[in-house]
């Protein structure tokens, strides 16, 4: 046979063999049992970051199309971080008997480019002050490595600053908004970042705002909605004020949604239309819930009736029946009604009043309860450290019926408390960044002391109570993918004072406790404390936690993607008074847990160990006596929502 014919046949055979490779691979379901990254020169990112960019993980089924897409994603990841000349080679090895595959990615990172210069076009007509504020934005900087995400962040922050200072139509040019110019040579290389803006040459002002209520069957007053608008006609346009106005209107219970849109083509003075959609006025909702009360975890539910426009003016009336269960000895039943009035005295203040009657089974006694809680909330600002102030006035009539005696104690409790709150956390249910801080001071017994002579069958307590709660959250994605570091600190102090024939010590329901699902998790509820009787609580609390939280299966598309893990250390204790506090009596707990994310929060289980128990005279440390570890130094905790 002619040599050329032999050559053609060889090419055809090799081509058919190559084309049959995907068919051979897909004929069986191979599981990826090993994935390796190797580097020809440098390694900048760890394997977890590369695996996340690739989107392929060990124990996945091998899919050639997915591998191809993953390699494209890996190249994009490198490109977005300034590695414009990166290359990757791939090799496969198969074990037909075990039906497994090993993947090897050979990466040449090559040069990582730095930013040589940053040029802004279209901002030459800004005021000197606004120009200075924009040039102080430093998400990207000269001589720092190129990073696409940081360039987007820089651009968005500049646009926000422009649109919050009158330049309503500011934007990047559609055809050439962001220009990246790469240059390289023997002695110098880098990228020029050029951001081309338009619409930053003419100031816009708010014009009139028309409020349109769709299907206003409840005759909702437009002036009620207008009070929530945070700008006036003639003010310089601010996107931030427009969005805040939308949020404020939508917060009214009767409102389902609110959108404020420009209503005129004028650049200088822009009229607006607030389109408001109402929700149903009446609502009855059953619910289930889990909560921690005095360190015990309760589960239960109830039903709530709400009138979202009670007597007009944005007022809300709600009625609840609520039952909670921990055990046959610990359970609660409450009926309550709450009235809420927005714009109380000031636009930023809200008044609410809650009446409650309840029956509570507690450790060693029963409570029959009737109480009234009046609260004034004042919103200060998102820009100040303290965002909100709360003033609470609480009056309670409580009867204690003790299980082991026939004696009855009647208490008239009244307390006024001022609380300041800072909260910039990014999520109510599961924060991943931000800081929460509250500090409160309260005084109990002032009103009872004035009227107690008219209530000869009642007793009261006099004390002041100080408390601060703090939580900080850090997103560790850049260090440990899909991870959060969280820490908390709580300090509380009760100082009793006063004399009188009807004066009694502070009752347990107003004291501090240690141990439990939201406390030191190596102890069961109320089992920790430097106290003669831990179930009666103490007057001084110091307690905190540090916790590492991580998504365990971030790549999964099934139910497993909602499973999270946690490692924690808890510390603290409760004492009779602050004068008895000692550092060597601070207890330590450690352990691990799992969470499953649901729409209402995480369902949580924690396994806690008593790392250091100051009350155990024979084996203070966990491993002092290994035989005790699973007998007296271990606790299982359940909860809904994170521990803090």
Question: Can you annotate each of these PLM segments?
Answer:
Residues 27-292, 303-304, 316-336, 469, ...:
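Periplasmic polypeptide-binding modules associated with outer-membrane biogenesis and secretion
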């Amino acid at each position: 046979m002619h040599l050329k014919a032999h050559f053609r046949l060889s090419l055809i055979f090799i081509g058919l063999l190559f084309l049959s490779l995907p068919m051979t691979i897909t004929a069986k379901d191979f599981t990826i049992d090993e994935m390796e990254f190797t580097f020809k020169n440098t390694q900048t990112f760890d394997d977890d970051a590369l695996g996340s960019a690739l989107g392929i993980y060990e124990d996945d089924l091998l899919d050639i199309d997915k591998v191809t897409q993953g390699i494209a994603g890996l190249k994009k990841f490198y490109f977005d971080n300034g590695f414009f000349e990166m290359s990757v080679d791939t090799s496969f090895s198969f074990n037909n008997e075990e039906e497994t595959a090993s993947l090897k990615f050979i990466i040449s990172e090559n040069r990582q480019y730095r930013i040589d210069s940053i040029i802004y076009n279209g901002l030459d007509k800004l005021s000197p002050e606004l120009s200075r504020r924009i040039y102080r934005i430093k998400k990207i900087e000269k001589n720092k490595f190129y990073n696409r995400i940081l360039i987007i962040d820089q651009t968005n922050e500049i646009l926000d600053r422009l649109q919050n200072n009158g330049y309503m139509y500011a934007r990047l040019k559609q055809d050439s908004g962001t220009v990246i110019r790469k240059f390289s040579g023997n002695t110098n290389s880098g990228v020029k970042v050029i951001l081309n803006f338009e619409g930053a040459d003419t100031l816009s002002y708010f014009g009139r705002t028309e409020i349109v209520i769709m299907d206003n069957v409840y005759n909702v007053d437009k002036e009620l909605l207008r009070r929530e608008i945070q700008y006036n006609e003639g003010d310089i346009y601010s996107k931030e004020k427009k969005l805040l106005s939308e949020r404020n209107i939508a917060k009214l219970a009767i409102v389902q949604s609110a959108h404020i849109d420009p209503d005129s083509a004028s650049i200088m003075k822009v009229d607006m239309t607030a389109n408001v959609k109402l929700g149903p006025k009446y609502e009855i909702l059953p619910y289930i819930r889990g909560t921690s009360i005095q360190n015990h975890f309760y589960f239960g539910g109830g039903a709530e009736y709400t009138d979202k426009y009670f007597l007009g003016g944005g007022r809300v009336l709600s009625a609840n029946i609520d039952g909670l269960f921990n055990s046959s000895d610990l359970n609660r039943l409450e009926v309550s009604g709450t009235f809420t009035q927005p714009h109380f005295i000031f636009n930023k203040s809200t008044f609410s009043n809650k009446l409650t009657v309840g029956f509570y089974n507690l450790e060693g006694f029963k409570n029959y309860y009737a109480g009234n809680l009046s609260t004034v909330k004042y919103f200060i600002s998102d820009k100040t450290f303290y965002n909100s102030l709360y003033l609470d006035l609480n009056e309670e009539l409580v009867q204690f019926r003790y299980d082991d005696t026939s004696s009855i104690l009647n208490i008239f409790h009244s307390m006024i408390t001022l609380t300041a709150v800072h909260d910039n956390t990014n999520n109510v249910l599961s924060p991943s960044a931000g800081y929460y801080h509250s500090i409160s001071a309260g005084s109990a017994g002032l009103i009872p002391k004035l009227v107690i002579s008219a209530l000869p069958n009642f007793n009261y307590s006099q004390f002041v109570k100080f408390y601060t709660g703090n939580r900080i959250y850090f997103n560790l994605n850049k260090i440990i993918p899909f991870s959060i570091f969280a820490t908390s600190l709580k300090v509380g102090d009760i100082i009793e004072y006063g004399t009188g024939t009807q004066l009694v010590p502070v009752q347990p329901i107003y004291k501090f406790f240690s141990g439990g699902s939201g406390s030191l998790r190596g102890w069961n509820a109320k089992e920790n404390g430097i106290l003669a009787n831990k179930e009666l609580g103490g007057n001084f609390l110091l307690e905190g936690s540090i916790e590492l939280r991580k998504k365990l299966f971030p790549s999964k598309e099934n139910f497993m993607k909602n499973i999270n893990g946690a490692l924690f250390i808890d510390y603290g204790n409760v004492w009779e008074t602050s004068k008895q506090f000692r550092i060597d009596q601070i207890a330590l707990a450690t352990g691990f847990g799992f969470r499953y994310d649901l729409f209402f929060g995480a369902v949580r289980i924690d396994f806690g160990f008593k790392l250091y128990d100051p009350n155990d005279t024979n084996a203070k440390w966990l491993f002092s006596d290994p035989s005790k570890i699973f007998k007296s130094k271990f606790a299982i905790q359940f909860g809904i929502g994170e521990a803090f």
